């Protein structure tokens, strides 16, 4: 154990604890912009500096370890002056149009600047603006980038793709797509991890809300919306709703009040995916097609983009089943359009999804005899949904917990567990068991693949199951870096599975 003093308080922490962690553990927050534990500990922003007695220069708290006898000051006049100047310099190279920023009210830089009471910038503004394709699902605004390196590190260390890199030197240092490529040329999986970890509004998903509003206002369009299982757990945070209050039924009611004609829960089409995927696995497994390499799930578009660019020889091992999002669109523009007695072109399908990769997935062009075009016409994220609710002046307190429209009202519990890593695998195995045995398996028969052990097992959960004295070897993987490690082991023959689920995030 290490004994030290922070802001006059004597504290004791474990060895190898950073000063920032030691302070946080004792209720002393130190501001930061670039720090991500275990991923980005390079002290690039210099906002987390503290004063160490006996040392003239300030030190960064995020990557300096607490040592015996240290006396630290986190908010001395010297620290405040340095921290304020640092943030003012960052702001002088940052587009401070906060009102029109997607991260307004949820921005680390905005919070730090407000806490330091910065009301004017004493330095000359020098804002960099790089061109970007605004049609791409992921949008980068270079004028808001603070060069924190988070996107670079998380893409390289967590997702193993290295889409982002540093360009230039000195004051001209910036972040851009690696290898002097455009984002379309890079191997971006659209996993969204760079967006999630960006502390400002430099990275965001393309906003498609106006397309949805236009469709709602078009009298010739029948707008049909679906809500993914994962959205129900996230949308309420923006409105301060508890998990019990933030139900999918209230989302459906909000969509109806916005003007959507029909609203459904994606759990229905998730059941369709599971039936197809479970049936396909059973066929390929019993036919001996999986003796060398496993069948992979196909419902995560980030994973699909990854395997197509990084392991094209394994694409044939993917399940041929569409994702629930795409199946929903196909059903709406064929069966549902027929039931309504309208042409497929009149149906405008909207997906409410938690993932930017779904915006890329919907843009795959598909042609059928019944109709030509996209299964899904627009995808909005959870954040876009909450913005639409606010812009429609809908108070969450007034929303009713309504049911999905018929005939796609009923669904099993399989679709709900899609939101958890391992949930697709568990649902598919339960379906395969039923198709093989003619009866449902015990409730917890395949729950092992959806355990909480991913963090302890490098993002991989392995499990073997016995069905009629036959062993089925499975694995569920979370994160593309972990997926790469597993695929390399499969290619080398070090491990063998029959069925593998991969989720990009």
Report the location of each language-model feature.
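Iron-sulfur-associated redox domains of electron-transfer enzymes in respiratory
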Residues: 15-71, 75, 79, 206-504
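Conserved SAM-binding loop
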Residues: 12, 147, 296
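Residue-level signature of catalytic and energy-coupling elements of molecular machines
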Residues: 8, 505
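Eukaryote-biased recognition of intrinsically disordered, low-complexity regulatory segments
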Residues: 1-7
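A short N-terminal beta-strand-loop micro-motif at the entrance of redox/enzyme domains
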Residues: 9-15
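Fe-S ferredoxin-like electron-transfer domains
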Residues: 46-190, 196, 200-218, 222
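Charged, low-complexity surface patches
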Residues: 12, 134, 144, 187, ...
């Amino acid at each position: 154990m290490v004994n030290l003093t922070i802001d006059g308080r004597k504290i004791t922490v474990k060895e190898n604890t950073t000063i920032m962690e030691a302070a946080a553990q004792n209720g002393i927050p130190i501001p930061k912009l670039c720090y991500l534990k275990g991923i980005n500990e390079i002290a690039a922003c210099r906002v987390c500096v503290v004063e160490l007695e006996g040392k003239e220069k300030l030190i960064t708290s995020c990557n300096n370890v607490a040592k015996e006898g240290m006396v630290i000051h986190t908010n001395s006049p010297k620290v405040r002056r340095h921290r304020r100047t640092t943030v003012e310099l960052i702001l002088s190279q940052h587009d401070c149009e906060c009102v029109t920023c997607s991260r307004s009210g949820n921005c680390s830089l905005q919070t730090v600047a407000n806490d330091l009471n910065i009301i004017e910038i004493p330095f000359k503004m020098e804002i960099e603006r790089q061109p970007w394709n605004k049609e791409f699902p992921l949008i980068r605004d270079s004028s808001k980038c603070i060069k924190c390196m988070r996107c670079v590190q998380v893409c390289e260390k967590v997702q193993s793709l290295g889409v982002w890199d540093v360009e230039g030197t000195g004051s001209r240092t910036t972040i851009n797509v690696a290898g002097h490529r455009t984002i379309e040329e890079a191997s971006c999986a659209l996993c969204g991890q760079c967006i999630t970890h960006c502390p400002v509004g430099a990275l965001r998903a393309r906003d498609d809300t106006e397309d949805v509003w236009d469709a709602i206002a078009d009298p010739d369009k029948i707008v049909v919306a679906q809500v993914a299982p994962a959205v129900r757990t996230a949308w309420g945070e923006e409105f301060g709703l508890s998990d019990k209050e933030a139900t999918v039924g209230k989302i459906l009611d909000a969509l109806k009040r916005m003007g959507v004609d029909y609203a459904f829960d994606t759990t229905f089409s998730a059941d369709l995916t599971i039936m197809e995927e479970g049936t396909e696995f059973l066929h390929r497994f019993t036919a001996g097609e999986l003796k060398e390499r496993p069948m992979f799930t196909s419902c995560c578009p980030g994973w699909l983009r990854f395997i197509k660019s990084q392991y094209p020889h394994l694409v044939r091992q993917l399940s041929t089943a569409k994702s629930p999002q795409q199946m929903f669109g196909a059903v709406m523009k064929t069966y549902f359009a027929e039931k309504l007695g309208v042409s497929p072109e009149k149906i405008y399908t909207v997906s409410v999804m938690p993932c930017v990769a779904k915006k890329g997935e919907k843009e795959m062009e598909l042609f059928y005899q019944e109709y030509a075009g996209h299964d899904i016409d627009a995808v909005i994220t959870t954040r876009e949904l909450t913005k639409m609710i606010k812009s429609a002046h809908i108070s969450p307190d007034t929303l009713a917990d309504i049911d999905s429209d018929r005939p796609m009202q009923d669904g099993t519990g399989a679709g709900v567990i899609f939101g958890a890593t391992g949930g697709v695998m568990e649902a598919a195995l339960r379906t395969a068991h039923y198709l093989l045995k003619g009866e449902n398996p015990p409730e917890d028969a395949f729950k092992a693949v959806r355990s909480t052990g991913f963090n302890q097992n490098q993002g991989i959960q392995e499990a073997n199951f016995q069905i009629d004295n036959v062993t089925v070897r499975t694995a569920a993987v979370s994160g593309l870096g972990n997926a790469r490690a597993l695929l390399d082991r499969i290619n080398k023959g070090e491990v063998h599975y029959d069925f593998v689920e991969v989720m990009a995030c």
